[in-house]
A protein has these predicted regions:
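Short coil-to-beta microelement around the adenine-binding A-loop and adjacent beta1/P-loop entry
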Residues: 16-17, 74
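ATP-binding/catalytic-site motifs of ATP-hydrolyzing domains
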Residues: 59-61, 65-66
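Helix-to-loop junction immediately C-terminal to a conserved catalytic motif
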Residues: 50
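ABC ATPase NBD coupling module
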Residues: 66-87, 112, 126-130
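Short beta-strand immediately N-terminal to the Walker A/P-loop
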Residues: 32-33, 82
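The feature captures the beta-strand-to-loop junction immediately N-terminal to the Walker
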Residues: 35-37
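Short coil-to-helix segment of the ABC ATPase nucleotide-binding domain corresponding to the Q-loop/switch region
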Residues: 92-100, 126
């Protein structure tokens, strides 16, 4: 079973059909990159998956649990998350402190090693202030 499964997803901005029948599966532990030029629908796809943008049709399941049509908070509870593009960080906190802000309910206040394994540049810059990053 796929950790994330998307079948025939359709999203619109008003009457403009912007995501057409998108279908894909992501296995547990798999890393996926969504790439494309500006305006190709990368952010729109992610906003559709997390529920920020409503979809008109299609199925989204997380670990076998249907989440299409559910509110954003229910999708987060199912294990989904979304980090928007741009500088949506605290500029006066370090990179490490910015990462830790998302770990408020965790008793061990250290950045998990898997984050640095997947994104080694974060480890190299963990002491830099977020506002100083380019």
């Amino acid at each position: 079973m796929a950790m994330l499964s998307v079948k025939a997803l359709n999203t619109y901005y008003g009457e403009s059909h912007v995501i057409r029948n998108a279908s894909f599966d992501v296995a547990e532990g798999e890393t996926v990159a969504i790439m494309g030029r500006n305006g190709m629908g990368k952010s729109t796809l992610l906003k559709s998956l997390i529920g920020i943008l409503p979809t008109r049709s299609g199925d989204i399941t997380v670990a076998g649990r249907a989440v299409a049509g559910t509110p954003t908070y229910a999708r987060v509870a199912a294990g989904m998350g979304f980090v928007p593009q741009g500088r949506m960080i605290f500029p006066y906190l370090t990179v490490e402190e910015n990462i830790l802000t998302g770990m408020e309910n965790v008793t061990d206040k250290t950045v998990p090693s898997y984050i640095y394994n997947v994104f080694p540049v974060l480890n190299e810059m963990k002491s830099r202030r977020g506002g100083n990053l380019s």
